[in-house]
């Protein structure tokens, strides 16, 4: 007898990149609380050029991976598919792509950034978010 068990976990952007959680938003919140880690949320769209640049240039960077994988549960979602539209309604600060949101481990929104960032600037923003 086969049993289907849902798999939630971490997916990785290439081998050296930031690990993104592969479950849904509710599971991200549970995991963040369980691990006592903040949440980094990348709200993107499949047609977005700056989003694609972040994916290929920033999220694959070893420095970004080392910083984010240690301190954050990272989550990314296409805001035009699946639970994306509902999350866009829940978080009105998502008003363009990419929108980069930082949450505390308890799920409260700390900060939203609109637009792509370099590795150094994204890490600086992430450090600042952890101070608040």
Where in this protein do the model-derived segments appear?
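Thioredoxin-like thiol-disulfide oxidoreductase module
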Residues: 27-29, 33, 60-131
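A short beta-strand-turn-helix
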Residues: 20-38
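Bacterial Sec-dependent N-terminal signal peptides
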Residues: 1-13
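Short pre-active-site segment immediately N-terminal to redox-active cysteine/selenocysteine motifs
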Residues: 36-39, 43-47, 96
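A detector for short, charged/polar N-terminal pre-domain segments
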Residues: 13-19
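Conserved redox-active cysteine motifs that mediate thiol-disulfide chemistry
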Residues: 43-59
């Amino acid at each position: 007898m086969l049993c289907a068990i849902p798999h939630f976990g971490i997916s990785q952007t290439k081998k050296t990149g930031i690990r993104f959680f592969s479950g849904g938003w509710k599971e991200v919140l549970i995991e963040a609380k369980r691990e006592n880690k903040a949440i980094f949320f990348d709200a993107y769209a499949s047609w977005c050029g700056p989003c694609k640049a972040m994916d290929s240039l920033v999220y694959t960077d070893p420095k970004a991976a080392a910083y984010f994988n240690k301190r954050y549960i990272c989550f990314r979602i296409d805001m035009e598919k699946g639970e994306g539209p509902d999350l866009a309604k829940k978080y009105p600060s998502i008003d363009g792509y990419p929108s980069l949101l930082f949450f505390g481990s308890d799920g409260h929104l700390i900060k939203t950034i609109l637009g792509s960032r370099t590795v150094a600037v994204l890490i600086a923003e992430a450090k600042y978010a952890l101070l608040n």
